[in-house]
Amino acid sequence: MAKAAAEILYEGKASNVVILKVQGLTLIADYFVIASVSNQRHGRALADRVLEGLSGVRQPDHVEGYEGGLWILMDYGDLIVHVFREQERAFYGLERLWGDAPREEIG
């Protein structure tokens, strides 16, 4: 499911799409998918694509930040998808926080 979400984001022109395997490092999820967008509209459009693309597999337990569009978080339990505007991604630095996690870059 992480790979599918990452590919949806990449096909939707997100930049710097990565999958972090955080299993064993945290209890909140097994995988993070992180992607950057240039503006809020693009972020909401990509969130919609992920929600639609994964709807046949699973519905998210929770979605946060959709209205603001600066950091959209889609929580699928074992997978958390983060769609950041570039500035917010740099500020929060999830890749730095989870630097020990195995990483796969998409694209």
Q: PLM features: residue spans?
A:
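P-loop NTPase catalytic core of nucleic-acid-dependent motor ATPases
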Residues: 27
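Long, contiguous binding/interaction regions
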Residues: 1-24, 38-45, 57, 64-71, ...
